[in-house]
């Protein structure tokens, strides 16, 4: 590395951001650019560690350790320290088709496995990645690169989320004709409608890449659901191969008393409608408003956090986020050693904003809803909760048990269910006759991605289950490689 003592000389520093109480008044991204000289010193903190773990992409105890797409992190950190930004961008694009997406929304498992992080705060890998690609766009270094020749092969990609876009980009580079089917009115899937604008700007960031893909020859067909608007049987007739990237969009429900009441919605319905109204410039459009309401969000993951941030920007009256798991410790527990993902207490952007407005972290840990209470008009007015404790049953599995005397009633005119996803929607899979695994995901081996039907591949959450955007990138690229091998007999596409 260019600065072997950088990790000793420089402290970890993250970019400045707009204050929570001011940024909730708009839908803009709130992280501010870091000056290049500061980025160079942050890159200099990357150690000459001998065996980097940051780019390993290994699964440890069900969670990612290191970058799932094997980003060449030490290489581009060194190049940034030396001021060689264009070369750093080239290194970044070798493994990541869309670093502006992961640089904004990835939880950065690379930082959790950074060797420096064993004893000191890790290198700010995520911010450096985002800064490299943002500078690339600003300097005009990111340009459409259509393939110089075409193979004549046609590939259909079903779904334009992160896995679908990576598969499309890679297969288009290989020279195949790519058609991406998307049932929404805009391409992008989760990136367009599932992640709020303040985390990932749709017009300035997402649409920019979509435009580039179109300029490179990728064809997007929106408002088209395969199986309804486009006959399923035509897929295998009209295309030489098919890559399914439909996501895991079936939400987990909460079938307790009062579930049928008005005002109880799945989180993704809330987030999608909000972003669509924002993009359509429709203040009075068909979206679910939290304005002036007591909001209860059930679920403590990223989607729940996005519901927190969105509700605050609507102008909610109050906000409580129920989390069934215990509050994590402030530091790594002994059974959570490096290089595992550190399971520690964090305040994400949504909780920071809620604390700024209401005075405290909105999360209520070890709490579950037991009943929804309605008014005389059939609208939810309160959520009944109880504190739980995790106890082992006879099979040795931990199950939640209610603690007597801890019952509470929380006022709520809007309840958002953000408890994760159960898997892909089944009608298209049924129509194709695809085999599925025990979790109802498409059956296709990791690394091969081939389904039970020759020429049909699966990638992303529809194959692996609910996961991170960066894992979708990994699978989209991998499926593209195997699809290209199927079409041509061999492949030059990287993993």
Per-region residue spans from a language model:
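C-terminal catalytic lobe of FAD-dependent flavoproteins
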Residues: 13, 17-37, 42-45, 365, ...
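Glycine-rich dinucleotide-binding loop and its adjacent helix/turn
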Residues: 131-149, 206, 211-228, 251-314, ...
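Glycine-rich Rossmann-fold phosphate-binding loop(s) that bind the pyrophosphate
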Residues: 158-162, 299-301, 461
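A conserved FAD-binding loop/helix module that cradles the flavin
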Residues: 304-307, 314, 462-493
């Amino acid at each position: 590395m260019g600065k072997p003592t950088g990790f000793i000389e420089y402290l970890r520093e993250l970019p400045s951001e707009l204050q929570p109480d001011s940024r909730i008044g708009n839908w803009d991204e709130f992280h501010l650019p870091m000056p290049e000289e500061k980025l160079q010193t942050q890159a200099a903190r990357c150690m000459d560690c001998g065996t980097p773990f940051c780019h390993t992409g290994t699964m440890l105890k069900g969670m990612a350790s290191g970058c799932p797409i094997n980003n060449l992190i030490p290489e581009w950190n060194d190049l940034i320290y030396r001021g060689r930004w264009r070369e750093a961008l080239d290194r970044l694009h070798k493994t990541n088709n869309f670093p502006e997406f992961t640089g904004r929304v990835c939880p950065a498992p690379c930082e959790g496995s950074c060797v420096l992080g064993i004893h000191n705060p890790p290198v700010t890998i995520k911010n450096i990645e985002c800064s490299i690609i943002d500078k690339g766009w600003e300097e005009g270094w990111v340009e459409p690169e259509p393939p110089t020749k075409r193979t004549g092969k046609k590939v259909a990609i079903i779904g334009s989320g992160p896995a679908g876009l990576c598969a499309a980009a890679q297969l288009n580079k290989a020279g195949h004709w790519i058609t991406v089917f998307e049932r929404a009115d805009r391409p992008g899937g989760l990136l367009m409608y599932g992640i709020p604008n303040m985390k990932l700007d749709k017009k300035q960031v997402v649409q920019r890449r979509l435009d580039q893909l179109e300029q490179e020859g990728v064809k997007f067909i929106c408002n088209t659901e395969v199986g309804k608007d486009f006959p399923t049987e035509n897929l295998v007739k009209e295309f030489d191969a098919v890559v399914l990237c439909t996501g895991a969009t079936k939400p987990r429900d909460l079938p307790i008393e009062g579930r049928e009441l008005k005002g109880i919605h799945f989180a993704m319905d809330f987030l999608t409608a909000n972003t669509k109204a924002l993009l359509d410039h429709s203040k009075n459009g068909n979206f679910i408003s939290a304005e002036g309401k007591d909001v209860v969000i059930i679920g403590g993951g990223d989607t729940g956090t996005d519901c927190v941030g969105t509700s605050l920007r609507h102008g909610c009256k109050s906000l409580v986020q129920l989390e069934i798991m215990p509050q994590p410790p402030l530091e790594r527990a002994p059974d959570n050693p490096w290089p595992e993902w550190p399971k520690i207490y964090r305040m994400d952007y949504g909780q920071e904003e809620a604390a700024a407005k209401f005075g405290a972290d909105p999360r209520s840990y070890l709490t579950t809803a037991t009943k929804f209470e309605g008014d005389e008009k059939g609208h939810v007015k309160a959520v009944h909760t109880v504190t739980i404790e995790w106890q082992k049953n006879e099979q040795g599995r931990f199950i939640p048990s209610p603690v007597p005397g801890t019952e509470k009633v929380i006022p709520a005119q809007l309840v958002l269910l953000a408890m994760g996803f159960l898997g892909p929607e089944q009608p298209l899979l049924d129509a194709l006759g695809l085999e599925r695994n025990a979790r109802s995901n498409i059956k296709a081996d990791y690394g091969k991605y081939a389904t039970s039907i020759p020429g049909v591949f699966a990638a992303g959450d529809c194959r692996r289950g609910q996961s991170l955007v960066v894992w979708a990138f990994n699978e989209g690229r991998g499926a593209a490689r195997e699809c290209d091998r199927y079409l041509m007999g061999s492949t030059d596409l990287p993993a």
